[in-house]
Every structure is written in structure tokens, then in C-alpha cells.
Amino acid sequence: MIRRLQDSGDLVRAFPRVHFVGIGGTGMSGIAEVMLTLGYEVSGSDNADNAATRRLAKLGARVMRGHSAANVLGTDCVVVSSAIREDNPELMEARSQRIPIMPRAAMLAELMRFRRGIAVAGTHGKTTTTSLAAAVLSEGGLDPTFVIGGQLLAAGANAKLGGGQWLVAEADESDGSFLRLNPLMAVITNIDADHLENYGNDFARVQAAFAEFLQRLPFYGLALLCIDDPEVAALAGKTPRHVMSYGMSENADVRAEDVVQDGPRMRFTLRLPEGTTTPVTLALPGRHNVLNALAAAAIGWQLGVAPDTIARALENFAGIGRRFNDLGEVTTSSGARVRVVDDYGHHPRELEAVFAAARGGWPDKRLVVAFQPHRYSRTRDQFDAFAAVLSTVDALVLSEVYPAGEAPIPGADSRALARAIRARGRSEPVVVGQIAGLAEVLPDVLQDGDLLLMMGAGDIGYVAQHIISNGFVGEQA
């Protein structure tokens, strides 16, 4: 049947049913929640049940466990995650039924068409920067829509449909999908060698993709670039768009001065383009988070948020799930009292930044790291860098690599990484074959007063939550 748009009066009623394949993913669940709020009938499937799928179900989405061709029957559009294989039965059925199929980034681009888009790109820091920007705009009364790759703790969600005209979202460079977006404002936090498997193992193609991302801005758009990052700084001089820079460099348009760490917080003076200076206490540790906050401040300044309002938003920021998330203290069976911090960091540069933040905030504590490498390809490509940064901690426990769908690569597993770290002569890493064994092994490594960092982009976060809830007893995977 051919549906006439004028018969329904709006597009939601004309094409109300949207199905998400891989609805539990961080990027997918956020878009699904926004579309639910817009009035769409949302369904979705995923192989795993998680907090995101449970939240969506409570909000009214129909969520199915596992993938089946029957799940897409009657739907008007199928949204697919980049993690989904082409032979997925739901995609195959959608093709046979000629149901429109949209990649996740394409649907985000559709949402952005109805708002003024702010897209935050960069190899590291996207989630934190996007979250801080949403907090600044909210504090400034702009009521933004946001779609974030992590849970904004103050909102209890990774997405929200706001009543204002601005939409702030992460722009994912990992698979090149950020090139589908057409924002009014684009942020680049940094450019690093990661996800090279999607760029023909050629870093020059990564650099070119970021340059093309800025080309997608309209002629009146704005590029907000972190010139403390050499790759971004090089891009700034070649970008044929309006540019505002941020960083700690003296020539940055928006910069931080007199930066000091005070426990889990950072204190600095925010200097804005008009010459205005404002003292800021940022509710996050680490110099890398100061840079993330500067990007949010630059966005706020551009949209007319007052400097004291920007400072208040940064001071009251409640954090993001799995981004230096201080879970509290727990006691081992031997009586050792340790503080547990959960973090998503999974690239050597991210590990280095988090370690620096931990040492800056708790200089008297031993730094114990439980790390789950993410992807065999990343472990191979960054092998020496991983060995170098992981050899700097006081004690280390490695679980096996979280494959994320990849087949094992010889010489790119945790045991090979442990041997490389051991050869440096600074630490004696402990290796556990399965992530479920971490909780049992850690008490043998920990001492009273330690700071335990549990890091990785796989499922190590569930172990951290298990330890806080149940102590150091066996985790059931």
C-alpha cells in the first residue's frame, strides 16, 4: 500500500515503526531512546541483555533477545550497527522485503537535520567532551538534545531529547561513519593511530578522513580544534572553514592557565577570546579532562553561555559511566582496604592519561591495574606502546584479549604482552585466562591503601561492579 504523507500529517505517523539491529550498543541505544521520545514505535534486537536494553524496554521499546527474520516484519525502517554482519537474518529479511536500511550514523544524521548539530570527533575523549558540552548547554538554559557513547550519570542515560535547537553528539571515526554527518559545529579532540583495520592500515587515510569531516561543515560552520594535539594543529592550518582553537598552548583561542590537580578535581583559569578569565574547578581528574572541558567551554562561549555558568557546569559535572568512575572502597579477605576505579580506556594513550590522573590525585597510593586488552588487532598494532605504558604501574593483572569479533592473532595476546612487559624488568604481571578469574586473583596482588584501576572496553566493567557489590569472590561470566 502506498502511504500519502498528507493523510497522516507528519512523518512519525506516516512511518512510525523503526527497528534497531544491535539495539544494546551505546550508540544505537541513545538514538533509539531519542526516537522513542519523538513518538516512534521502537523495536530492537540484541544478543545480550544489558542496562541499555532494560532501560529501553521500560520506556516502551519492544526488545528481543537474539536475531530473527521475524523481528523486522511490519517495520518501516531498519537501523543497523556497524558491528552487525551482512548475513544477519534481520538484514537479509529487510532486504528481501525492501525495507529501508540505515546505518546508525545515517540515522543520527537524520536527527541532526532537525536540529543544529554539534559533532564531537577525535580518537580519544569524545564521550567525555560530548557529555561536558551537554552539561554546559543545559546549565546555560539551552536544553540540548544529546546522544552520547556512555551514560551521563546526572541524566541516568546516554541520550535525551531536549526542547532546544541544538543537538550534540559523538561523531564516530572508528569506521568512517562520521563522514555521514553534516554538523554546524565540529570538534576534533585529537587524532591518533587506532582502528587502522578500517583504513587499510594506513594512518594517512585516517588523517584524510578527519580533514574530510571538517569539509562537511557549511561555509558558515565552525571547527573547534585542540591545537595541543600535533595532528589536529596541523589540520587547523589547512582547514578552509572558520576555526576556533582550544588547549593549554599560549596561542589557543580558549585556553586553560595555572592548571593544578587537587585530588579527583582539576583547578585552572579559563581564558576566553574576549580576554575574560574565570576560575574553574573541574569535577574530573587529569590534564586530558581539562582539554575536554575546554572544548565544552568553547562550545558554550560560542552559543552565549556566560563564563560563570560554564564554570558552574564544569564544577557540578556528575561524570560519565566508565570514565574514571570512582566506585568506592572495598576490603579483601585479608583486610586490605582498596579504592576501585572503573575506566573505559583501552588505547596506550588513554592508559597513559588515566595513570597520570591517578598518580596526580592519589600520589601516595600504589597504582594497581587490572587491564583487559580490546581487540587482537589493536594489541598487535600498539604492542610496544602497551608494553611501555603498562610497565610503569606498581602491579599489573592482565586478562585475555576481548576479541570484539576478531580471530586471535599470533603474538598479540595477553601472555605475549606480559612477556614483553616482564622483559623490561620493572614489573611482574599476572595473567588470568578468563575475565571471570580477575576477582579471585586480585586479592593476592593488592595491599592495604592501593588504588585499583580496572580498565578496558570489553566486559571488565561488569567485574568491577561485581567486586563492589560482592567483594573479591568468583565472578560468574
Swiss-Prot record:
Q: Source organism's superkingdom?
A: Bacteria
Concerning Gene3D superfamilies, the annotation shows: Mur ligase, C-terminal domain, Mur-like, catalytic domain, NAD(P)-binding Rossmann-like Domain
State the EC number(s): 6.3.2.8
* GO annotation, cellular component aspect: cytoplasm
Can you tell me which residues bind ATP?
122-128
Q: What keywords appear on the UniProt entry? A: ATP-binding, Cell cycle, Cell division, Cell shape, Cell wall biogenesis/degradation, Cytoplasm, Ligase, Nucleotide-binding, Peptidoglycan synthesis
Picking any one GO biological process from the record gives: cell wall organization
Which pathway is this protein assigned to?
Cell wall biogenesis; peptidoglycan biosynthesis
| A single MF term (Gene Ontology) | ATP binding
Q: Which reaction does it catalyse?
A: UDP-N-acetyl-alpha-D-muramate + L-alanine + ATP = UDP-N-acetyl-alpha-D-muramoyl-L-alanine + ADP + phosphate + H(+)
Q: Where found, per UniProt?
A: Cytoplasm
Alphabetized NCBIfam families for the sequence:
murC (TIGR01082)
Chain's role: Cell wall formation.
Family under the similarity heading: Belongs to the MurCDEF family.
State the name under which the record lists this protein. Answer: UDP-N-acetylmuramate--L-alanine ligase
